[in-house]
Amino acid sequence: MAISSRSVGMTEIHCNFPQNPFRRISRRISQFRAGFPDKKPAAGACEEQDELTSGSAARIQRRDKQLPEIIGSDRELMSKLTTLGRPYRHFPFMGNRHVETIFASFFRSWPVIKSRRECLRMEDGGTVELDWPLEGEDAELWNGELPVNSPVLILLPGLTGGSDDSYVKHMLLRARKHGWHSVVFNSRGCADSPVTTPQFYSASFTKDLCQVVKHVAVRFSESNIYAVGWSLGANILVRYLGEVAGNCPLSGAVSLCNPFNLVIADEDFHKGLGFNNVYDKALARGLRQIFPKHTRLFEGIEGEYNIPTVAKARSVRDFDGGLTRVSFGFQSVGDYYSNSSSSLSIKYVQTSLLCIQASNDPIAPSRGIPWEDIKENPNCLLVVTPNGGHLGWVAGDDAPFGAPWTDPLVMEYLEVLEKNQIEKPLRRTIDDVHTPRVDSVHTRETNNYKSPIENVN
């Protein structure tokens, strides 16, 4: 999770740095560390230890504390992912989870990308918007036309997020460099998407995603389709994968910083009065900024809606209690969280899925990860980094201002899946899904608007 500069009343910062001013410092520190030998391992320790479960899944715990922990049973796939062997060495002074989270939000660069926006009308009359990148600062990257059968990547941002978020833009650039089409799915009310029904979106509402996937599949009938979700977008994506199970039209997916168990995430979120309290208020502010534009839709509405509480929500729980849980028919906030967790869905996933988590994530705590269900599902691969915060991951060649450490791993995983799919026929089991209507299309400069909250749930 990260907070944009606007959400705390600071001047917006657009960090498109041509050079990395800290790289020399980092190199000096690395040289200093290299002068000292590694500590001897304890008696009986080995370079790599595999603990096999009855499901033949491996839990790889390495002596090097900077290497990620990996859980998965597809050894052939893991052998092809060279980036899995990279240690996670956070940028100097980024060892604290809050520092890494907030630094990434404020100081990660925002690539300039122009997009074509499609406004889609859903089956219930609701509206979502898709942003298709057209061009950017690197003209040569965007000038050439991609083959019609190039793979397509659907991106699902976090809570109140959209195509303006820096982590989304960096993934758009990386996908293009690899010759992939990509599109950002902006949920109802997010990134200036209009709200046309008295309903926003929730952690378990997958009908919009079903229709977006159908729309993309119809448009790119010769391409394999994949999806990447961050935080709340990851929870929605995994819920979708579990619901469609063996009838999933996606060829693969990636989940990053997924809260998984929303009850546990909510419990940890409200422990103490530290940074989590700051995050909660910032998130609530982002939701409040969306709501006033659409209050007329809730005038005179029946039910247990508490509009005054929603309009003044000081926490995400306030907003969910007054609006979200009522819109989607839950009895209470606790009922909503316990029945919307993607940890309930992971066992049903039959699509290749990579889950990347940070062990020190302040918003998606590691104790909420469904470790056993992931180990027992041969379609899932879990990577847990020792640090990273919430969608921070300020490490790797592009640190501190560039793309997060996870991006090369995400793209390599998708490329391996696509290579395996080339020989296989496309599966499109979406005939029973409503095809959304395109209401309008227009060009949009994505840098004109910044979400009040970035990198969050």
Swiss-Prot record:
Residues 438-447 have a biased composition (Basic and acidic residues). This is Embryogenesis-associated protein EMB8. GO terms for molecular function: monoacylglycerol lipase activity; short-chain carboxylesterase activity. Belongs to the AB hydrolase superfamily. AB hydrolase 4 family. Residues 151-391 form the AB hydrolase-1 domain. Keywords: Hydrolase, Serine esterase. Pfam families: Abhydrolase_1. Residues 39-59, 438-457 are annotated as: Disordered. Gene3D superfamilies: alpha/beta hydrolase.
